[in-house]
A protein has these predicted regions:
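Function-determining surface determinants
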Residues: 1-238
């Protein structure tokens, strides 16, 4: 559901030149929903990898299990907040507004998929060109956001069945995955550092080592997959 909210907001942003600002209230409500979904989804991603890594620990396992247990308890708190949001009148109103938009908007956007994809590709290219040889974590995260936006408009083009757009989608998804793995590792290390205590120190240190290895791997690979995505994108929108 969080992916759907992000995709919808990205498409609203991309179609602003065609549709104007009339969907901005919907975008704001989708942002609210994404904010409710985010903490649970982020913890799901983090816990999925930590459970596997902690199970492979030896002497440090008890400390690792303590970290996992605290994160699981935090997830339950956020899950309760999410369920409250999904049961609210605000969510029901959002659902009705979104459904109405789906009924009316597609006709206005017929034939614009290639134009939308080309616009987001240009922004993706510009962002990629601005990334220095040794980017900061924030610079890579910003590039990831542009990759996601490019992906969502590319998916519109792929709905036409054009093979070049299908190949573009595959390539930009690969780029997003590599850069996303870097951001996941950054977030994981931050969370682990916040949970360090004397009895967890060895486990946290070992888990942080694994996250840093993921970051190094992503940094070594991201430029190649980004360049491939841009190449595929140029072919798709030509």
């Amino acid at each position: 559901m969080r992916v759907a909210t992000r995709r919808s907001r990205a498409l609203i942003r991309a179609t602003r030149s065609t549709l104007g600002d009339r969907l901005e209230p919907l975008s704001a409500e989708l942002k609210w929903l994404g904010g409710a979904l985010g903490p649970v989804r982020d913890l799901d991603v983090l816990l999925e990898r930590l459970r596997v890594e902690v199970a492979a620990l030896d002497l440090e396992r008890e400390g690792g299990e303590s970290i996992v247990a605290e994160l699981e308890a935090e997830r339950e708190v956020h899950r309760a907040d999410l369920l409250a949001a999904l049961g609210s009148d605000r969510y029901l109103a959002l659902f009705d507004t979104f459904t109405a938009a789906l009924d009316s908007i597609p006709q206005e956007l017929a034939g614009t998929a290639q134009t939308l994809a080309a616009g987001e590709l240009r922004r993706f290219e510009k962002a990629a060109a601005a990334v220095p040889e040794e980017p900061t974590d924030d610079e890579l995260h910003g590039l990831r956001i542009h990759a996601k936006r490019a992906r969502y408009t590319a998916e519109l083009g792929a709905l036409t069945g054009r093979k070049r757009f299908v190949r573009y989608v595959d390539a930009v998804v690969a780029a997003q995955d590599v850069i996303g793995a870097h951001q996941d590792a950054v977030v994981a290390e931050e969370r682990l550092r916040a949970l360090v205590s004397p009895e967890r120190a060895l486990a946290a240190g070992r888990l942080i080592e694994l996250e840093r290895a993921r970051r190094r791997d992503s940094r070594a690979r991201y430029r190649e997959v980004v360049d491939e995505a841009i190449t595929r994108g140029r072919a798709a929108v030509a």
